[in-house]
């Protein structure tokens, strides 16, 4: 066991005070200083302040501009919805509880916060997987005469919600459970204990394999094949400056997408697996809190990578924010026209995140 276990909680083992109090009833300032809880609350406020506008704006701009309502963009809207789930279901709750220094909302609140935060995170995770598959299918054309349409896009959305629910619902019905984690003011899946009757061992293995390793393999495979296809298309044309520039742009986008995926999920999954496989080892409350920051901050950098990097989305956002006029339209239009001719086969429009 990695700490002091109580009814539906587990206080981390590294606790120099020797005090153990229920995180549902008492402030946990004996674990870390009140300043750390204030910093956590401020960080959550920052995520809300930035994450809500950029994700809400994504939905609003798509509704306002008909040209954005294409099947390939459906998954990006799904990603924005997932981020809003995390903002309202996770960040607001954590900000409120961190101001009190413990999970003041009780056991029911812990279940709700853990569920919505996990659901939003998993929808986001599987949206990135579906996004990679869609780009691979559209660019690499592994299926001849296949035309990606609205029905395929809707199937992709349904798939993300099914996979997310298959991860977020089981802890509510007895396969594992949601408990306060890290600094004890936010809730997540129980990686810490092997509590009798909850089958935590099998659920953690299931989560690690089906909701981390498999998505990771799929993302690497799809983007790896996509890069190969882009390089082959570039090699088949004359090695002109425009072709090389388009190839570099696509490569840069793919690398950023993969790095964003790893930054989001690798720290959290690695630490959770370490805690689970090293029962009895000592770790402090910050050991699990800090990796969770990376996963939570995806609500900001996912839109930046997958939406703001896309010229069409970016131009429409600027037009909306500037009351119907884009002051940068001429510059971007000129640069787009200059690079369209010879680089059409490696055009980033099929690869970029929209």
UniProtKB/Swiss-Prot annotation:
Under the heading InterPro entries, the entry gives: GPCR_opsins, GPCR_Rhodpsn, GPCR_Rhodpsn_7TM, Opsin, Retinal_BS, Rhodopsin, Rhodopsin_N
Ranges per topology, Extracellular: 1-36, 97-110, 174-202, 275-286
According to its UniProt record, which protein family does this protein belong to?
A: Belongs to the G-protein coupled receptor 1 family. Opsin subfamily.
* Record function comment: Photoreceptor required for image-forming vision at low light intensity. While most salt water fish species use retinal as chromophore, most freshwater fish use 3-dehydroretinal, or a mixture of retinal and 3-dehydroretinal. Light-induced isomerization of 11-cis to all-trans retinal triggers a conformational change that activates signaling via G-proteins. Subsequent receptor phosphorylation mediates displacement of the bound G-protein alpha subunit by arrestin and terminates signaling.
Q: Which organism is it from?
A: Oryzias latipes
- Residue ranges in the Cytoplasmic topological domain are 62-73, 134-152, 225-252, 309-354
**Which residues are the lipid attachment points (S-palmitoyl cysteine)?**
322-323
Q: What is the designated name of this protein?
A: Rhodopsin
């Amino acid at each position: 066991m990695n700490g002091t276990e109580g009814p539906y909680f587990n206080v981390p083992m590294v606790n120099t005070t020797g005090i153990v109090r229920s995180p549902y009833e008492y402030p946990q300032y004996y674990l870390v200083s009140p300043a750390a809880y204030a910093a956590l609350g401020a960080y959550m406020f920052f995520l809300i302040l930035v994450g809500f506008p950029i994700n809400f704006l994504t939905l609003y701009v798509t509704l306002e501009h008909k040209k954005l309502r294409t099947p390939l963009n459906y998954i990006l809207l799904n990603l924005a919805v997932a981020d809003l789930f995390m903002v309202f279901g996770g960040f607001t709750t954590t900000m409120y509880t961190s101001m009190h220094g413990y999970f003041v909302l009780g056991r029911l609140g812990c279940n709700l916060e853990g569920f919505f935060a996990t659901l939003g995170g998993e929808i986001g995770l599987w949206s990135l997987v579906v996004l990679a598959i869609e780009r691979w299918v559209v660019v690499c054309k592994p299926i001849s005469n296949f035309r990606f349409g609205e029905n395929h896009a809707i199937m992709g959305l349904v798939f993300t919600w099914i996979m997310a629910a298959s991860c977020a619902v089981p802890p509510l019905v007895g396969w594992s459970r949601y408990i306060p984690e890290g600094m004890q003011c936010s809730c997540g899946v129980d990686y810490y204990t092997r509590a009798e009757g909850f089958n935590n061992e099998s659920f953690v293995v299931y989560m690690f394999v089906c909701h981390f390793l498999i998505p990771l393999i799929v993302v690497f495979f799809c983007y790896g094949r996509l890069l190969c296809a882009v390089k082959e298309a570039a090699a088949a044309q004359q090695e002109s400056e425009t072709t090389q520039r388009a190839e570099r742009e696509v490569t840069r986008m793919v690398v950023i997408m993969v790095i964003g995926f790893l930054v989001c999920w690798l720290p959290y999954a690695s630490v959770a697996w370490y805690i689970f496989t090293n029962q009895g080892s000592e770790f402090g409350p910050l050991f699990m809190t800090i990796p969770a920051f990376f996963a939570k901050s995806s609500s900001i950098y996912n839109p930046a990578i997958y939406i703001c990097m896309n010229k069409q989305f970016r131009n429409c956002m600027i037009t909306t924010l500037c009351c119907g006029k884009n002051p940068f339209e001429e510059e971007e239009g000129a640069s787009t026209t200059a690079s369209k001719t010879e680089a059409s086969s490696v055009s980033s429009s099929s690869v970029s995140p929209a």
